[in-house]
Amino acid sequence: MAVVTVLSGCIKEKQTGADLKVGDRLPDFEVVMSDGETVTDQILQESVSVVMFFHTSCPDCQQVLPQMQSVYDEYAPKGIRIVLISREDTEESIESFWQEKGLKMPYSAQNDRKIYEKFAATRIPRVYVNEKGGIIRYVFTDDPNPSYDEICTALENVIR
């Protein structure tokens, strides 16, 4: 007899944080990116933005991150802010994963859940597409993982 286990997200988690939805405003936060830039919710209100939470050992995140690099390559030159924030991940593991996958986009290594819990309680990857002014217009989780095309379509809809 076979036993099948269905997992919710990469890791079974207890709900402890916020659960931002479409129409909500980005919460107050500040992170320092790997390129030294400080990003805040106030800065993200100045343009269309994408915020993604990830962990490098999460299989779903491992699938989505290379797609996010393609999104970054296409939209960052157009002034769209793409902000990747780790959840309980180390700078070393992120650097190693970035090098292994050939990723170039900046990220913010967070070794705890303080920033993540301002956005969500459970599930990664988690991708927020936000309009100018900091209002969330799309939320993608691992149910199912967002594709490159879905993220681009969301961005195009918000840009219009």
Positions of the model-derived regions?
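Bacterial N-terminal signal peptides
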Residues: 1-6
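A short beta-strand-turn-helix
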Residues: 30-49
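Thiol-/selenol-based redox modules, centered on thioredoxin-like
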Residues: 129-160
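Hydrophobic beta-strand anchors of alpha/beta hydrolase catalytic cores
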Residues: 50-51, 82, 127
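Short pre-active-site segment immediately N-terminal to redox-active cysteine/selenocysteine motifs
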Residues: 47-49, 54-58, 123
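Short, internal strand/loop/helix patches
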Residues: 95-133
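N-proximal helix/coil linker or "cap" segments that precede and/or mark the start of modular domains
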Residues: 7-28
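Conserved redox-active cysteine motifs that mediate thiol-disulfide chemistry
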Residues: 53-70
